[in-house]
Amino acid sequence: LCHPFVTQMADGTLPPEKFRYYMLQDYLYLKDYVKIFAAIIQKADDFEQIRFLSGELADTIGETFRTHIPYMKRLGITEEEIHSARPHMDNNAYTHYMLWEAQTGDVLTGLVTLLNCSWSYAYVAEKIVERCPDALRDKRYGSWFAGYVSESYRRTNQMLIDRIDALSGFIDEKTAEHLCEIFEKCCLFDLRFWDMVYAMGGN
């Protein structure tokens, strides 16, 4: 909540170059994020799980095309820049860790790898908007905050949380500790992501 990237977005002072770099890196992150869903689907053992996971995967891809790519174009990011962009090593480390946990664990493990990113963005956006309502009206960054405080995004998050709660009802202590470790590591990776885009995105 106190990271300069999000606080400067909230008051409209974040240099546009930093946000452009963030959007490109986030786009690359999302490409791996959907692969993690695909890895989890392979572990699903009934049609209901497959239906839920496939729906989440389709929603993520759809949101990328409906919102993320048009947003990048409004920022002046060209198709050439999008296709030539390469993930920063911190971005790679994050998604590779998530994918490894999803591939080597079960459905619950895979869903926990996804939880931090989804949940933390909603939490950060909500708290920032509570503290600084004008953030929603900022010409450059307002729609970013609006997306993460929207009812549809909250509903999607709650579905993920409910699914994790249902699957974790009978796990043992060792498994619970491992899942907590995954969540904590993903929190740290997310913080490093903010640090990375703030440092690499120009002055």
Where are these regions (language model features)?
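Short alpha-helical hairpin
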Residues: 1-14, 33, 159-170
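Alpha-helical bundle segments that constitute or directly flank the non-heme di-iron/ferroxidase center
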Residues: 13-43, 63, 112-122, 194
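Inter-helical linker of Solcar repeats in mitochondrial carrier family
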Residues: 18, 109, 175-176
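Secondary-structure edge/capping motif, primarily at the C-terminal ends of alpha-helices
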Residues: 40-44, 102, 125-132, 167, ...
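Active-site-proximal alpha-helical scaffolds that flank and shape metal-associated catalytic sites
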Residues: 48-155, 184, 188
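Long amphipathic all-alpha helical oligomerization modules
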Residues: 150-183
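Acidic, carboxylate-rich catalytic segments that either coordinate divalent cations
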Residues: 178-203
